[in-house]
């Protein structure tokens, strides 16, 4: 980089600007600050259904997984509707 280009400033191409912006967006999403529903929640819900189905007959809609975030606190809420057991 020459002294002249340093003083005047280099004109960045739109491709490099777009690349930098995408990198910032990806880093932001990977940090988890912007994700309201992480990628692992659907897989977690499927695995819970598979394990519980070994013991009790339930439908996919009977399991609800919800993640709530506030500041530095994360709460994972899992609601499972089990069928009535007749004795």
Curated annotation (Swiss-Prot):
Prevents the cell division inhibition by proteins MinC and MinD at internal division sites while permitting inhibition at polar sites. This ensures cell division at the proper site by restricting the formation of a division septum at the midpoint of the long axis of the cell. Keywords: Cell cycle, Cell division. HAMAP family: MinE (MF_00262). Belongs to the MinE family. GO terms for biological process: cell division; regulation of division septum assembly. It comes from the Bacteria. This is Cell division topological specificity factor. InterPro entries: MinE, MinE_sf. Pfam families: MinE. The keyword rRNA-binding does not apply.
């Amino acid at each position: 980089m020459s002294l002249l280009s340093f003083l005047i400033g280099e004109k960045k191409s739109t491709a490099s600007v777009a690349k930098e912006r995408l990198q910032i967006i990806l880093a932001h999403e990977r940090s988890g600050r912007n994700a309201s529903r992480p990628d692992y929640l659907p897989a977690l819900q499927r695995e819970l259904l598979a394990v519980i189905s070994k013991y009790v007959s339930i439908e996919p809609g009977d399991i609800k997984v919800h993640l709530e975030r506030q500041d530095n606190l994360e709460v994972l809420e899992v609601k499972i509707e089990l069928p009535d057991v007749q004795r």
